[in-house]
Amino acid sequence: SGAKVADGRIVATASGIAVAPHLVEIDPTTGVVTPLATPAAQPPQAGALTEVTATAEDGTALRAWLRLPDGTGPHPLVVFAHGGPWGSWNAWTYRWNPNPFVAAGYAVLMPDPAISTGYGQHMIDRGQHELGGAPFMDIMALTDAAVARVDIDAKRTAFSGGSYGGYMSNWVAGHTGDRFRCIVTHASLWDTESMGHTTDNSGWDGPMHVQNATYNPKDAVADIQVPMLVIHGDKDYRVPIAQGHALWYDLNTYSATPRDDHGRTQHRFLYFPDEGHWVLGRGNAEVWYRTFIDFLDEHVQGVSRQAPSTLG
């Protein structure tokens, strides 16, 4: 991800889906990569890592990574949709890290659909102008391939994502009925028509404007049937908090999600007054992971958890 050249030696930082950033030396003649000594060991990895493949409707080869808990399963599954939208799961992150979910007993599917990087310009172009089109269909194809495995429980699944992945979560919520038991959406685009006029990235308005009539998640709110956990930071200027507020209001006013036995909404809102587009504070990150996993436990596994003590 970064490199320095001195005395014929190339020193760089390298990382991957299961490897945190670390220093390496690259031989410019042979290309051999040698890890260098570091003061801290690599973070331990939970479970096992494998790949899932599928074929898109247009014949494009698709890939996802699948992190599996220990044991034979079948395991409950949570799907992670990446942000960007130009991105890939083939990178280390302390946000949206699968380890806590795997440790909690969940298999984690991380698909790279149309618009993902690392697969050539054609892959990006497939999804560039239809954010709820080919990327959605690719993710569903990879999810189908994952739940066909004997170690995955097809009846206990959830969907999630942040930023563009949150857009995808909202889109999935309105277009898959009760396929997933619950959906978690973080810093998400809900109303693309208003989003382009309020974000700090004004470049969004043009590309989104021509897609609003076809790919605006808000238009399918009446078809949302499952509980959603909405997460947003008040200091988010990339996807302003108004998107989260609008989503929360629309879910509780117009969605088809049934209320609980006491007539209360099953949707939840996790609000961070001091966070932006990313949740970076250590205590806040712990609350993020705990609340996320507790929501999965409640709706995927039928187990209620006590809210984290640090949750205000």
Give the residues covered by each predicted segment.
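Short loop/turn positions at the edges of beta-strands in beta-sheet-rich folds
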Residues: 17, 56-58, 177
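Hydrophobic/aromatic beta-strand patches that form the interior of the parallel beta-sheet core
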Residues: 24, 52, 79, 109, ...
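Structural motif
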Residues: 18-25
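Helix-coil-helix junctions within alpha-helical repeat/solenoid scaffolds
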Residues: 5-8, 25, 29
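Cap/lid segment of the alpha/beta-hydrolase catalytic domain
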Residues: 31, 37-163, 168, 190, ...
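Active-site-proximal cap/loop segments of hydrolase catalytic domains
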Residues: 113-312
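Conserved beta-propeller blade repeats
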Residues: 1-13, 42-51, 97-99, 220
